[in-house]
From Swiss-Prot:
UniProt-listed PANTHER family: PRE-MRNA-SPLICING FACTOR RBM22
Disulfide bonds: none
Record protein name field: Pre-mRNA-splicing factor RBM22
InterPro entries listed in its UniProt record: Cwc2/Slt11 (IPR039171), Nucleotide-bd_a/b_plait_sf (IPR012677), RBD_domain_sf (IPR035979), RRM_dom (IPR000504), STL11/RBM22-like_N (IPR048995), Znf_CCCH (IPR000571), Znf_CCCH_sf (IPR036855)
PROSITE patterns: RRM, ZF_C3H1
Subunit structure: Component of the pre-catalytic and catalytic spliceosome complexes. Component of the postcatalytic spliceosome P complex.
C3H1-type zinc finger span: 159-186
Region (Disordered): 303-343, 372-420
Taxonomic path: Eukaryota, Metazoa, Chordata, Craniata, Vertebrata
């Protein structure tokens, strides 16, 4: 009993007729006003080979036209989009989702068994409320931390871009900016992502995109608790303007008693202090790389104690050998610190040995009598800037040191070794 479009068969009651497709937000596009064409029994499903209603639309400006590739029955069996065949809940390939939920694909692949299985699944779908998937996926009740970490919560509209213009690659395209295809260099043909098959993606086998995501999941960073057992505070970043203290409390109260929640709206972050260390560790483990509040993915880290921050502040301007260096005098406050000072705050700038003499303090001398004092910092040319230390309100964010301040630099003791 065949149900394909090309065969002259009596069993046309199994052909699918739908009023609206099952699509993900990415394939539907960012434009809320789209024009969609509907072709009844337009093509055969690429999985079950049954005729179904084909929908075609343009998801946005300078995007390629998209259409449904599989029927709605095959889409409901796997809970995937009819166009991209990605999971509707997580936005991931079927192979990644089944690996995270420990599901095993049991769909038949031969024609006769496939038709019999499809008819049974259609009967099960008709008896359900339509809000939950059927089959093995509908019976899976456990959630996976890996899926929550890899899930794509926001649409990725770059996936709807046009294909690469083959004439432009050969240097023969004469349309210029009017060409509806992309004028970009194609990817490496040896790249596994360049060869994808829609049936392999549906059945969850040999999917290069899924293999890439599974490798990324195996190398994901972990949030280890600090050695200081007194730290019970978590840092939550990326709040935005919509997430409030009550939203954070509604999520974190399940892990234990919360002592305080401090929201820093200017920095779009919050500090959540728990009453016990055990509650903080459970909250960090359950929320790291998988915390989503009001549709926003939040960054969770461990807070730092006041003692640790005080030690870091004391180390500013001190070399690894313990030599205290004075800040460079005469720099106006408008100058930002050099990038190297920000990135390598604890580096040894001067290559000092482990033991060295204390630094020499440079004392600025007052100007000779009869000479007007130099203008204040920020006025006049740089050569006339004051050499003394600027006022406290004009200092740079951190102390800055030059290699010439190092007493062990090359040439500092040249006079001692010179011949008389």
């Amino acid at each position: 009993m065949s149900t394909s479009l090309g065969s002259n068969t009596y069993n046309r009651q199994n052909w699918e007729d739908a009023d609206f497709p099952i699509l993900c937000q990415t394939c539907l596009g960012e434009n809320p006003y789209i024009r969609m064409t509907k072709e009844k029994y337009g093509k055969e499903c690429k999985i079950c080979a049954r005729p179904f209603t084909v929908f075609r639309w343009c998801p946005g400006v300078r995007m390629r036209f998209k259409k449904t590739e599989v029927c709605q029955t095959c889409s409901k069996l796997k809970n995937v989009c009819q166009t991209c065949l990605l999971d509707l809940e997580y936005g991931l390939p079927i192979q990644v989702r089944d690996a995270g939920l420990s599901l095993k694909d049991e769909m038949p692949k031969s024609d006769v068994n496939k038709e019999y299985y499809t008819q049974n699944m259609e009967r099960e779908i008709a008896n359900s409320d339509g809000t939950r998937p059927v089959g093995a996926l509908g019976k899976a009740t456990s959630t996976s931390d890996m899926l929550l970490k890899l899930a794509r919560t926001t649409p990725y509209y770059k996936r709807n871009r046009p294909h690469i213009c083959s004439f432009w690659v050969k240097g023969e395209c004469k349309r210029g900016e009017e060409c509806p295809y992309r004028h970009e260099k194609p990817t490496d043909p040896d790249d596994p992502l360049a060869d994808q098959d829609i049936k392999d993606r549906y059945y969850g086998i040999n999917d290069p995109v899924a293999d890439k995501l599974l490798k990324r999941a195996s190398t994901m960073p972990r949030l280890d608790p600090p050695d200081d057992k007194t730290i019970t505070t978590l840092y939550v970043g990326g709040l935005g303007d919509t997430i409030t203290e009550s939203d954070l409390r509604n999520h974190f109260y399940q892990f234990g008693e919360i002592r305080t929640i401090t929201v820093v709206q200017r920095q779009q972050c919050a500090f959540i202090q728990f009453a016990t260390r055990q509650a903080a560790e459970v909250a960090a483990e359950k929320s790291f790389n998988k915390l989503i509040v009001n549709g926003r993915r939040l960054n969770v880290k461990w807070g730092r104690s006041q003692a640790a921050r005080g030690k870091e502040k004391d180390k500013e301007g001190t070399t690894e050998s313990g030599i205290k260096l004075e800040p460079v005098p005469g720099l106006p406050g408008a100058l930002p610190p050099p990038p190297a000072a920000e990135e390598e705050a604890s580096a040894n700038y001067f290559n000092l040995p482990p033991s060295g003499p204390p630094a020499v303090v440079n004392i600025a001398l007052p100007p000779p009598p009869g000479i007007a004092p130099p203008p204040p910092p920020g006025f006049g040319p740089h050569m006339f800037h004051a050499m003394g230390p600027p006022p406290p309100f004009m200092r740079a964010p951190g102390p800055i040191h030059y290699p010439s301040q190092d007493p062990q630099r090359m040439g500092a003791h040249a006079g001692k070794h010179s011949s008389p």
